[in-house]
């Protein structure tokens, strides 16, 4: 029996930066199905836990929203403790047969922590306070690191500029940029 699969859903670049006690997380708005752009203004950033955290997602949208719902429940269960909620979600992601099939990543920032929860159930805390996920993430990450090192731009400005650079390079990233700040 021949296995046929649906076109791969590719969408997004999400980047978050913490600088001088301020955090910003932003994304582009493009969603593609195979080689076709199906939406230009997808909302990929959410405020969580009484507005104290920002979370963004990349990957299959329904999968990402499922994970965000579960993450929010973990935040509530653990009193808003970002690291504990992230580790518990990652543990569930690795051990639950249903969750293991979900294809998404989540980037989360608070004013002092930046984490990535990967599609393999890993919790990653970058040393430099910059998180990036999605198809244009490496372009945005390189831009953000350079801007952090060589400018005095705010976290919000670094996120904005990094996404603009990624949009100029990555075909799965557009310039419909949304940035949220804490």
From Swiss-Prot:
The keyword Hydrolase applies. It catalyses: ATP-dependent cleavage of peptide bonds with broad specificity. Coiled coil: none annotated. GO terms for biological process: proteolysis involved in protein catabolic process. GO terms for cellular component: HslUV protease complex; proteasome core complex. It is found in: Cytoplasm. Its EC number is 3.4.25.2. HAMAP family: HslV. This is ATP-dependent protease subunit HslV. It comes from Chlorobium chlorochromatii (strain CaD3).
């Amino acid at each position: 029996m021949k296995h046929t699969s649906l076109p791969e859903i590719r969408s997004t670049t999400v980047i978050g930066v913490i600088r001088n006690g301020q955090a910003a997380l932003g994304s582009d708005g493009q969603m593609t199905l195979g080689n076709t752009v199906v939406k230009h203004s997808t909302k990929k950033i959410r405020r969580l836990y009484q507005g104290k955290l920002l979370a963004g997602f990349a990957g299959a949208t329904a999968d990402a929203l499922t994970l965000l719902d579960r993450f929010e429940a973990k935040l509530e269960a653990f009193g808003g403790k970002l690291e504990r909620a992230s580790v518990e979600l990652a543990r569930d992601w690795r051990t639950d047969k249903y969750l293991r099939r979900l294809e998404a990543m989540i980037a989360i920032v608070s004013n002092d922590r930046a984490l990535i929860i990967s599609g393999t159930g890993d919790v990653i805390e970058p040393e430099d306070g910059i998180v990036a996920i999605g198809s244009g993430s490496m372009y945005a990450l390189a831009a953000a690191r350079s801007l952090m090192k060589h400018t005095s731009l705010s976290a919000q400005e670094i996120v904005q500029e990094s996404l603009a650079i990624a949009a100029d390079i990555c075909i799965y990233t557009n310039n419909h940029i949304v940035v949220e700040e804490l």
